[in-house]
Amino acid sequence: AALATQKLFTSWVKSGKIRSMFKKVMQNVNFPEMEKKILADWEKTGLVEKYLSRNKASEKRFSFLDGPITDNNPMGVHHAWGRTYKDLWQRYFNMKGYRERFQNGFDCQGLWVEVEVEKELGIHQKKDIENLVPNDRKASIAKFVELCKARVMKYSQIQTEQSKRLGYFMDWDNSYYTMSDENNFMIWHFLKTCHRKGWIYKGPDSVPWCPRCETAISQHEMLTEDYKELTHKSIYMRLPLAGRKREYLLVWTTTPWTIPANIAVAVDGNLDYVLVREESGDKYWVTEEAVERLFGKTGKTVKKAKGAKLTGLKYRGAFDNLPSVKKIAGHPKFHSVIPTDVQIMPISTSEGTGLVHTAVSAGQEDFTLGKKLDLPMIAVIADNADYLPGLGKFSGQNAKKHPEIILDHMQNEGFAWKIENYTHRYPACWRCKTELVWKVTEEWYIAMDRPEKHVTGKGKTLRQMMKETAQMIDWRPKFGLERELDWLLHMHDWLISKKNRYWGLALPIFECQKCANFEVLGGKEELKKRAVSGWEKFEGKSPHKPYIDEVKIKCSKCTETVSRVSDVGNVWLDAGIGLFPPMLILKPQN
C-alpha cells in the first residue's frame, strides 16, 4: 500500500496535477494588515461577545483570576507569553461549557510607575518631586500623583490594544484597576481585619533599602534577577586586642561602608581557632581552616582554642574617636567578641577568617543577632546613604558612592591587613537598579507568627493558616506545593509600608503621637464617620496622597487629633487583593 501511494504521488508531481491542488502563496504577506482585517471581521460578526457569553446560563463554574499586568510601559514578550497561557486555559474551560469571568486586571500603583515618571520629568531625587511646584510641597505631590495616574491610563489603553492583537479574548470594557477607589478601600478592609486579629504592628528592623528611591525593599520585591554579579573592594581588618601586645582579631568584610557601625566580632563557639604569627611578629586569630589560605607557609601557629574561649575579649576599632561611637562605648558588650547563633548567622570556614564583623544597624543577620544578645547600635546612614552627623569627616559623604574614604582611613590608621577585589552576587533595587544597603528603620508589618486574637481557644497564626490553605490546593505540577511550603516556612513578617514615596495605597493607619495608640480604618464610610476635620477638602478625590491626608480623626484613647501615617503601602498588597473587589461588595455582613 505504501509503495502504491508513493507511485501515485510521483505521477501527480510529474503531471503537474499536485500544483493545482494548492493556491499560490504570496511572497510578500503583510501580516499586521491581515491581523487587523481578522480583528475587524470578529468585531463585525460579534464573535468575541458570543465567545464571552456562550456559557452565561451554565451551572458549571470555572473561577479564573487575571493577575494584573503592570500598565507602566508597552507589553514585553514575557507578557505576551503569559497572556497566551491564560487565554488557552480559559478557552479550554469555555469549550467544556463552564461559565467564567473574563476580567483583565491592570496593576497601577507603586515605585515602578514613580521611577518612569521621574525619567519623563528628568528628575533624579525625592526632593525634586516635592518641588515640582516651586515652594509648594502639597501641590508638587498632587501634580506628581496625577502624572502617575495619567501614565498608567495611557499604557493600559496601549496594552489593551496589544492584547487584542494577540487574539486574547477578554471583557475589555470591564477591566479592574488596582488604583481604583474600590481596590484601595478593599485593602483598607483587609488591613483592618488583620489588625482586629492582632497581626499589624510597627517595629524596627534592618531592611534592604534603596538609597536613590529612599525607601525599604521588601522580601517579596527582592527578585532573583535583581541580584547582580558585582566586584567590590573587600578588606581584612586587624583589630588590636585590649591588653595584648601585637595580638589581633583578623576580620573580613565585603561591605567596608558598614565598618563605622561595628559593634562586635562574632565567632562560632564550636570551631577551632588558632593564633598565627607572621614573620613581622604580629599575631592574628583566625579559624584553623583559614591558615594556609591566608598565610601560606609563612604563618606559624602559636596557640589553639575553641571559639567559646575567645568570647568576651575586647578590641579597639578604627573609628573609636567619632562622637556617635563614643556615645555607646560604655556598653559592656561594645567592641567585644561574641558567640554567634548559627541559626541566625552561620559562620563559614571556606572564605573569610571565621571572625565576622557585626554591624547591628547595617545588616539583617547582624540586627537579629544583636537583638538576641542585647547589643547596642550605631546608626550611620541617612535615607540617601549619606553618613549621618556625629561621624566626623565622614558625615555628609555617601557611603556607597565613596567606599574609598573608609578604606583610606583604615590604611592610614593601621587597621588594614589586606584590601582586594571581591566578586559576588549583590542585590539591586528592582525598579531603579541602584545597589541596596541595609538600614534599621521603623516600618509597618503583618506578623506571620502571632496567634489570631478574639477566637475561641488558641488562635492560629497567619503562617499556619496559609500552610493549611496551600495543602488544600491541587498543585500542577506537584512540586509547586513543596516550594510554596518552603517559602512559607522561611517567610519573614510581611513588610507592608513604604516610607518617603507618593504613588500608592495610602495606608489606613492613624497613629497618635501623644499616647502611641494606633488605629486601622476599614473603608471610606468609616473614615467619613471618624473625621473631625478635612473631609470636605478630600471628598470627591481619590484616596491617594496628598488628598487623603487632609482628613484627621480623634484618638479613641486620649481624644488627641490624629493624622494618617505618611507611608504608602507595599505594591504587593494591590495585586494580592485582586481576588476580592470584582466579586465582593463591602456591606456590614461581609
Residue map of PLM features:
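Acidic, Ala/Val/Gly-enriched low-complexity intrinsically disordered segments
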Residues: 1-4, 13
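Short, positively charged and aromatic/hydrophobic N-terminal segments
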Residues: 10-11, 17
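Short, contiguous pre-domain boundary segments
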Residues: 21-30, 464-478
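N-terminal, positively charged nucleic-acid-binding surface of large information/translation enzymes
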Residues: 21-280, 359-372, 376-391, 413-461, ...
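Catalytic alpha/beta core of large soluble enzyme barrels
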Residues: 99, 261-267, 271-382, 459-463, ...
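Short cysteine-rich clusters marking metal-coordination/redox-active sites
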Residues: 210, 429, 512, 552-558
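Short Cys/His-rich local motifs and their 1-3 flanking residues in nucleic-acid-associated proteins
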Residues: 212-215, 434, 514-518, 557-560
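Alpha-helical recognition segments enriched in aromatics with Gly/Pro capping
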Residues: 241, 346-348, 373-385, 501, ...
